[in-house]
Regions:
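N- or domain-start disorder-to-order transition segments that initiate the globular core
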Residues: 1-30, 34
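Hydrophobic faces of well-ordered beta-strands that scaffold small-molecule active sites
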Residues: 20-26, 41-45, 108-114, 139-143, ...
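Active-site beta->alpha loop and helix N-cap motifs at the rims of alpha/beta catalytic domains
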Residues: 49-51, 56-148, 152-153
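C-terminal extensions of enzymes
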Residues: 293-361
C-alpha cells in the first residue's frame, strides 16, 4: 500500500497535478531558486524588475559597470544599462537550463524585455529581439502588444525567436498576437524550418486591468458590488483561453501582474503559465486555498454584467471587436504601463550615470 503523495507547497502541487506551469516573475537569483524548488520552469523580467535587482545587488554590479565603462569608452549610459540587463538575464537563464532541456524548449526560458521606448518602431524592436535571442539558447523575448509590436511579433516568430507578448490586457490584443504568431509560424513552415521547440506565450497583465477598473471606479463615482473589479482580468483571461483553445492557436497564455489569489487560483488547470512575483508565491504557498482546476468555472454572470454595464473599457477588453489595432497604443492600461516601464529605463540610465559621473558634491 502506497502512502499519500505529498507536495512541497500549493504551487508545487499545481505543477505536478495540472497542465498549468509556474514561472517566476523576476530574474533575481534567490527568488528564482525558491520558485524552482516549488516547481517553476521559467522566469520573466521587465525594466522595473531589472532595475530593482541592480539596486539590490549594487555591490556586485557597480564594479561591473566600472569594467564596462573602461572596456567601452564611447558607450552611453543607456548602452551600458542594456548590457547589464543582458548579463543578469543570462545569469538567471543558466538556472533554467535543466527545465529547458526537459521540456524541449516549451519551458525553461528566461524572458528579457525589449526597450519599451521602441514601442512604435517594429524594425527596432525586431533588431533588439534578434540580439537578445543570441544571449543564450533559452531566451524568450518580450515584445509589447502595440500596433508596431504586433508586426514585430510576426517578424520575430518567422525568424525563429520565441516571444512573450507583453503590455497586453485585452482579448483583441491577444487575438492579434495569436494571429501574428500563426502567420510567423506558417512562414517558417513553408520554408521547411523547425517550429516545435519554440516556446511562445502571450501575457495578460490581469492585475493591471483590475487596477484601471479601480481607477475608473473612483474617478466616475461608480457603485458596484464589493470585489467586482478584482474579477476583470480573470474574466478576460478565461474568455481568451476558451477562444485560444477552440481555435488551436500555438501559443500559451500567461497570467501576470498579481493583485489577488484569483490571478492564480481561478486559472489552475489551464494549459497556460502562471508567473507571480516571489512575494505572491510565498503568500500562495502559505495559504490553505484548495489546488483544483477552476479554469473552466465561469465568472459569475452578475459580476460580468456589472463590469460590462459600468466600465466601457472593460467592454473593450472583453469583446473581440472592442479595440482596433490602431487603438492598442492609446488604451489606458497600455499607456500607464509603458509610462512606468519607460520611467524605469530612465532610472536605469541614472544608476549607470552615478557610476560614470559620481556626484562630486
Amino acid at each position: 500500500m502506497t502512502g499519500a503523495v505529498t507536495y512541497k507547497s500549493p504551487l508545487h502541487q499545481m505543477t505536478q497535478t495540472t497542465p498549468t506551469c509556474l514561472w517566476n516573475d523576476s530574474a533575481d537569483i534567490d527568488e528564482l531558486r525558491y520558485a524552482i524548488e516549488n516547481g517553476a520552469v521559467g522566469a520573466t523580467c521587465n525594466p522595473v524588475i531589472a532595475l530593482g535587482i541592480l539596486k539590490k545587488e549594487i555591490g556586485i554590479w557597480k564594479p561591473r559597470i566600472q569594467d564596462l565603462l573602461r572596456e567601452q569608452p564611447g558607450a552611453t549610459e543607456d548602452q551600458i544599462g542594456w548590457e547589464l540587463i543582458g548579463e543578469l538575464s543570462v545569469r538567471a537563464a543558466k538556472l533554467l537550463e535543466p527545465a529547458f532541456a526537459e521540456h524541449r524548449g516549451r519551458n525553461g526560458r528566461l524572458s528579457v524585455q525589449t526597450d519599451p521606448r521602441l514601442y512604435r518602431d517594429a524594425g527596432a524592436i525586431v533588431e533588439q529581439a534578434v540580439a537578445f535571442d543570441k544571449l543564450a539558447p533559452n531566451m524568450i523575448v518580450k515584445i509589447p502588444a502595440t500596433k508596431a509590436g504586433i508586426a514585430a511579433i510576426e517578424d520575430a516568430t518567422h525568424r525563429g525567436i520565441s516571444i512573450n507578448a507583453t503590455v497586453c490586457f485585452t482579448l483583441p490584443q491577444c487575438i492579434a498576437v495569436a494571429e501574428a504568431v500563426e502567420r510567423g509560424l506558417r512562414r517558417r513552415e513553408s520554408e521547411g524550418k523547425e517550429v516545435r521547440s519554440m516556446g511562445t506565450v502571450c501575457t495578460i497583465m490581469v492585475g493591471r486591468l483590475d487596477d484601471w477598473m479601480k481607477v475608473l471606479l473612483d474617478k466616475r463615482d461608480i457603485s458596484v458590488d464589493p470585489g467586482v473589479t478584482e474579477w476583470a482580468g480573470v474574466a478576460v483571461f478565461k474568455k481568451t483561453y476558451g477562444i485560444f483553445r477552440e481555435r488551436g492557436y500555438r501559443l500559451r497564455l500567461l497570467s501576470a501582474a498579481f493583485r489577488n489569489h484569483m490571478h492564480w487560483s481561478e486559472l489552475i488547470g489551464a494549459d497556460a503559465v502562471i508567473s507571480p512575483p516571489s512575494v505572491w508565491q510565498k503568500r500562495f504557498n502559505a495559504s490553505d486555498i484548495e489546488v483544483r482546476p477552476r479554469i473552466d468555472d465561469p465568472v459569475e454572470a452578475k459580476i460580468v454584467d456589472q463590469l460590462l454595464g459600468h466600465f466601457p473599457d472593460f467592454r473593450r477588453a472583453y469583446s473581440e471587436e472592442g479595440l482596433t489595432i490602431d487603438e492598442f497604443d492609446s488604451f489606458a492600461p497600455t499607456v500607464r504601463t509603458l509610462r512606468q516601464f519607460i520611467a524605469a529605463c530612465t532610472d536605469l540610465d541614472g544608476l549607470v550615470r552615478d557610476v560614470m559621473l559620481p556626484d562630486p558634491s
